Amino acid sequence: MHSSKRVMTTKTHVEQPESSMRPQLPESIQGSLMDVGMRVRKSISTGYKSKQTTFPAYNPPLYNTVSENIALKNTAFSYEPNGTKRPFEQAIPNYNWANPPQDFEEPEWLKPFDVVMEGTNERL
């Protein structure tokens, strides 16, 4: 909660005649009431609106025509008609360099420990 309060410093109201039905309140109380009223007004979603609009909110449809839907399904990224789903292995072209043959020997320090120990007679 705020510890500072607003205090009206200037008189913006016109002096009312004595025959008014409203009781006279000190300026500090009038300022507090105005402050509370503005807080209530801010907390209501329509608090700052002075009049209602006559037009309701309108959200146009995402796609206007059937031809737009068909055009979006057939994008440049679909390799088969209608974007048929397929496994990853079929989606990648089969090039020779994709899986090169093993033409080198793997260094000892890259092999798993049990494979390294197969060639020795040592026991753990």
UniProtKB/Swiss-Prot annotation:
<dbReference type="GO" id="GO:0008104">
    <property type="term" value="P:protein localization"/>
</dbReference>
<dbReference type="InterPro" id="IPR013900">
    <property type="entry name" value="RNR_inhibitor"/>
</dbReference>
<dbReference type="GO" id="GO:0005634">
    <property type="term" value="C:nucleus"/>
</dbReference>
<feature type="compositionally biased region" description="Polar residues">
    <location>
        <begin position="1"/>
        <end position="31"/>
    </location>
</feature>
<dbReference type="GO" id="GO:0005737">
    <property type="term" value="C:cytoplasm"/>
</dbReference>
<dbReference type="GO" id="GO:0043495">
    <property type="term" value="F:protein-membrane adaptor activity"/>
</dbReference>
<keyword id="KW-0131">Cell cycle</keyword>
<dbReference type="GO" id="GO:1990846">
    <property type="term" value="F:ribonucleoside-diphosphate reductase inhibitor activity"/>
</dbReference>
<keyword id="KW-0832">Ubl conjugation</keyword>
<dbReference type="GO" id="GO:0051301">
    <property type="term" value="P:cell division"/>
</dbReference>
<dbReference type="GO" id="GO:0005829">
    <property type="term" value="C:cytosol"/>
</dbReference>
<feature type="region of interest" description="Disordered">
    <location>
        <begin position="1"/>
        <end position="32"/>
    </location>
</feature>
<comment type="subunit">
    <text>Interacts with cdc22.</text>
</comment>
<protein>
    <recommendedName>
        <fullName>S-phase delaying protein 1</fullName>
    </recommendedName>
</protein>
<comment type="similarity">
    <text>Belongs to the DIF1/spd1 family.</text>
</comment>
<keyword id="KW-0539">Nucleus</keyword>
<dbReference type="GO" id="GO:0044877">
    <property type="term" value="F:protein-containing complex binding"/>
</dbReference>
<keyword id="KW-0132">Cell division</keyword>
<dbReference type="GO" id="GO:0006240">
    <property type="term" value="P:dCDP biosynthetic process"/>
</dbReference>
<keyword id="KW-0498">Mitosis</keyword>
<keyword id="KW-0963">Cytoplasm</keyword>
<dbReference type="Pfam" id="PF08591">
    <property type="entry name" value="RNR_inhib"/>
</dbReference>
<comment type="function">
    <text>Regulates the ribonucleotide reductase activity through its mediation of the nuclear localization of suc22, the small subunit of the ribonucleotide reductase. Delays the progression of the G1-S phase transition, thereby ensuring the G1 phase is complete. Interacts with both p34 and the p34-p56 complex, although no direct inhibitory effect on the bound proteins has been demonstrated. The action of p14 may happen coincidentally with the cdc10 function or may happen downstream of this.</text>
</comment>
